[in-house]
Amino acid sequence: MKRALVCGAGGFIGGHLVKRLKAEGYWVRGVDIKEHEFHPSVADEFVLGDLREQSVCRKITGDLRFDELYQLAADMGGAGYIFTGEHDAAVMHNSATINLNMVEEAKNSGIPKIFYSSSACIYPEEAQMDPANHGLPEKIAYPAHPDSEYGWEKLFSERLYLSYQRNYGIDVHIARFHNVFGPEGTWEGGKEKAPAAMCRKVAETADSGEIEMWGDGEQTRTFLYIDECLEGVRRLMESDFSGPVNIGSDELISINDLAKMVMGFSGKDLRIRHIPGPLGVRGRSSDNKLIQEKLGWRPTWPLSKGMEITYRWIEDQVRSRRNP
């Protein structure tokens, strides 16, 4: 039986990844600074620990022989957390420290294969000024100019892991995630992403009411459902391709149209009030030519399919909170 160590197992993607690995027959140790928000972890062992502490990283890697490490732990959140500038130092310090600690202890304990979750936020800001974005191929990451400290740290850590691959022979695989969403993700409190925030606003608002939206709503994104994200991760880890490679949808949608899609699921007719707020770039889409070439696969789910599943889940969360 293969053993996997999942860092960030108390988070959205990490929690789903643990379930996927267990379904494939892995023995899994999950690690996070917090428990999973919505259910107990299904990991064989779940360790509460702060990966900014090197002693914690040494302990979780040193007592067992792991076949694979999945490093998803990071200080992150939605636009309201990443783009205000108020958390820049924490994002840089916390995430960089986690990655420096984990890759060193993985090397010291002889973990042969590592997955690192990077982000589309590494791409240059000037390549994302047009809402009609035609996709961000991996090769345009340099010259580097991410639009946030979150993106800069991700780019640094890509290079960190690849340097350990070159110098120590670790089999490293890196994916650049593009706006992953789905059930069991944060949907309130300021760290939620756009799909969850939109679902919450619509679910909480009475018919004929009004929801608020940052900016003019013409900014565009692609959003990837969690099941397809995990399929991409597992295919990448089973391949001989290191990446970095995009794992994302190429179905571009404006935030205005995303809101209308969610309203359609709800059956409500709501007004949108546009207000000032952090926006990020104007247009971001995944270019999937490389993943198709290297893995013979690309995401295919229509956005509406995943969004309806997510809306129904968040609608249930809102209803349960109102009627405990």
For each feature predicted by the language model, list its residue ranges:
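N-terminal Rossmann NAD(P)H-binding glycine-rich loop of SDR-like oxidoreductase domains
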Residues: 4-24
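Conserved glycine-rich Rossmann-like NAD(P)H-binding loop of the short-chain dehydrogenase/reductase
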Residues: 26-35
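Rossmann-fold cofactor-recognition segment
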Residues: 42-53
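Active-site helix of classical SDR
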Residues: 149, 153
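NAD(P)-dependent short-chain dehydrogenase/reductase
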Residues: 126-135, 159-237, 250-252, 260-266
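NAD(P)H-binding glycine-rich loop region in Rossmannoid oxidoreductase-like domains
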Residues: 51-95, 108, 125
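C-terminal substrate-binding subdomain of Rossmann-fold SDR/epimerase-dehydratase oxidoreductases
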Residues: 204-324
